[in-house]
Amino acid sequence: LAEFDLINDSRALGIQPFSTATENAFLENLTHALENIWLSQSKYVIHKEVAISQVFQDNMTYDDLFYMGRFDFVVYEKQGKKELPVLAIELDGKEHFEDAVVQERDRKKNAICQAHNMEIIRVENSYARRYNHIKGILMDYFSRVH
């Protein structure tokens, strides 16, 4: 509980905890890479901290995570005035490799994406600031789906 309070106090003071700073750096690199891949055609947009229930219309797995969980990032394809989700991206810290509860939540997120035919890509925190790595992941994804 103290850690949670510390994070909230830090955010209230305008000080970003490490994870938020890492996520923001990742989002900046992700956005930059996406723009470079599509040469600023503005074909895609990225949203951060998206509720799983906002991405998919139906809960095929009937799991609480569907209603409570969030994706770190979702890439949407612009189609007219609509935005269609095409890719979920999770930024994974060490807890994703060491904590059984977090690993189970990750398995459920993977299953939800699989049930809805949407790819989920997991990126280790240590790569969050590595632009070329992030661009490579996106180029690999788009080369397979387009």
Feature-to-residue mapping (PLM):
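Nucleic-acid endo/exonuclease domains
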Residues: 1-146
